[in-house]
């Protein structure tokens, strides 16, 4: 399995002949190396409804026929407002089997809304995501602050990789993300959600260097991937 990073919180997972896009913020993101019109994933997974995470989901899903996995409130909005048909609604605490493996939604401390036609639309609770693919557990924290139940996430799902936001202001900053890494005890920690715009400017290498002894961190450059 290969996992690649494409700026902000967009990652791509390739397992066998299946491609999964997570939070595909591509258009309008000069930190992303992908082109929305070229993406043909089998699945799109969304952590929450903010525009820098939903991104190009509607266009990509309609072009590719991808199944969109997300919280049920966001799923309803995408179906009714944007005409998406292939949607797998879930909620926090639930897990579901798909052709590529299992998805489980966890809590995240953040918001989830958009503005449509001048009105603010709340899109359910934000989530983190635990993927179990090829007997590996991948935790994608989404946008979140630090919370102590991250310890429980790591205990229940021994983690091979954890993707953690470090941008501060809207999410955890580097200091809290380092504590999150301690709580989770993943084999590998990868920072995300930083340097997309000035308000979340951070030094990811400094974050990795700050991790506790015994915790391995890796900065993925845009388009770079890891094999697990």
Curated annotation (Swiss-Prot):
Belongs to the UPF0173 family. GO terms for molecular function: hydrolase activity. Signal peptide: none annotated. Pfam families: Lactamase_B_2 (PF12706). It comes from the Bacteria. Transmembrane segments: none annotated. PANTHER family: UPF0173 METAL-DEPENDENT HYDROLASE MJ1163, UPF0173 METAL-DEPENDENT HYDROLASE MJ1163-RELATED. It comes from Listeria monocytogenes serotype 4b (strain F2365). Keywords: Hydrolase. NCBIfam families: PRK00685.1. InterPro entries: Metallo-B-lactamas, RibonucZ/Hydroxyglut_hydro, UPF0173, UPF0173_UPF0282_UlaG_hydrolase. This is UPF0173 metal-dependent hydrolase LMOf2365_1599. Gene3D superfamilies: Ribonuclease Z/Hydroxyacylglutathione hydrolase-like (3.60.15.10).
């Amino acid at each position: 399995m290969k996992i690649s990073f494409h700026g902000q919180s967009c990652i791509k997972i390739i397992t066998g002949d299946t491609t999964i896009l997570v939070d595909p913020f591509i258009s309008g993101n000069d930190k992303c190396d992908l082109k929305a019109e070229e993406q043909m994933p089998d699945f799109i997974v969304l952590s929450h409804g903010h525009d820098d995470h939903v991104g190009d989901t509607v266009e990509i899903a309609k072009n590719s026929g991808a199944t969109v996995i997300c919280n049920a409130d966001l799923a309803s909005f995408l179906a009714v407002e944007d005409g998406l048909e292939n949607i797998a609604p879930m909620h926090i605490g639930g897990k579901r089997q798909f052709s590529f493996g299992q998805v489980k939604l966890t809590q995240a401390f953040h918001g989830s809304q958009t503005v449509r036609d001048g009105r603010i639309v709340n899109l359910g609770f934000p989530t983190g995501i635990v993927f179990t693919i090829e007997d590996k557990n991948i935790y994608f924290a989404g946008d979140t602050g630090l919370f102590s139940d991250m310890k429980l996430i790591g205990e229940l799902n021994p983690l091979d990789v954890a993707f953690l936001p470090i941008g501060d202001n809207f999410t955890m900053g580097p200091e809290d993300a380092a504590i999150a890494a301690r709580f989770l005890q993943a084999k590998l920690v990868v920072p995300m959600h930083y340097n997309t715009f000035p308000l979340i400017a951070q030094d990811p290498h400094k974050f990795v260097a700050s991790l506790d002894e015994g915790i391995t961190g890796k900065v993925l450059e845009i388009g770079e991937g890891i094999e697990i």
